[in-house]
Amino acid sequence: MLSKLNKKIERVFKEEPKEVNCKEYVDHMDIHQPFVCVGYKMDACKTKAEAFEKDFAVNMWLDSIMGPLNPKFQEWLDQRIFTQFVGAEADFTLDHSYILFYAQTVNPNAFIELVNELVQNKSISDEDYQSLHAQAIANNLRGLDHFDGLANDLLRSHFEEYDYIENLNSIQNMKIEQVHAYIKDLDFSHSCVTKILPNDSI
């Protein structure tokens, strides 16, 4: 159907604001232990290449600070700052970006304080980089042997207009200096804390 406006019709998206919509949200559910999530709103990326590389670099850093690679991880478990349900993840795209730290914990405030301390350490050790980088390359190579997954990845890259093989190469060629550059660029000033607490009846 032709447009009566005689003009090209385009989808218009409002620019994502830098500020979070709400700094704290608390809800109650039928659970036995609280859940907490500390989210940080990040600037959207300017190019697809930047989004892919930054996503990989930041998630590598998160694996090094919020996981068994961190020597203090077992100590935090013993102190019950969090349970086995704990993690961190990041997503960087052209229209939005964020970093999340989440956990099940009997002491949400202690977890929040821990996260606030962790994000001040914007670095990754050479040992952690070597380990996580080698693991990522190995996972990519194994992925090339799973043809169903490979077909889906190639199809997705076609529709999202990026080069799948080029992205794999960018991971293989990424140096620790690039990882540090992306980490140092992070701005943690826009945060939101979400708490899911047990109902009084539990």
Model region roles, listed by residue range:
Residues 1, 111-116, 182-185:
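Active-site-proximal alpha-helical segments within enzyme catalytic domains
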Residues 1-45, 199-202:
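An aromatic/glycine/proline-enriched structural segment found at the starts
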Residues 1-9, 117-126:
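A common structural junction motif
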Residues 5-6, 57, 61, 101, ...:
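Hydrophobic alpha-helical transmembrane segments of multi-pass membrane proteins
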Residues 25, 87-89, 180-183:
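Generic recognition of flexible, low-complexity loop/linker segments
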Residues 31-37, 43-69:
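A conserved active-site cap/scaffold subdomain adjacent to cofactor or substrate pockets
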Residues 35-45, 51, 73-122, 128-174, ...:
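M16 family metallopeptidases and their MPP-like homologs
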Residues 180-182, 186-192:
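Bilobed periplasmic-binding protein-like "clamshell/Venus-flytrap" ligand-binding domains
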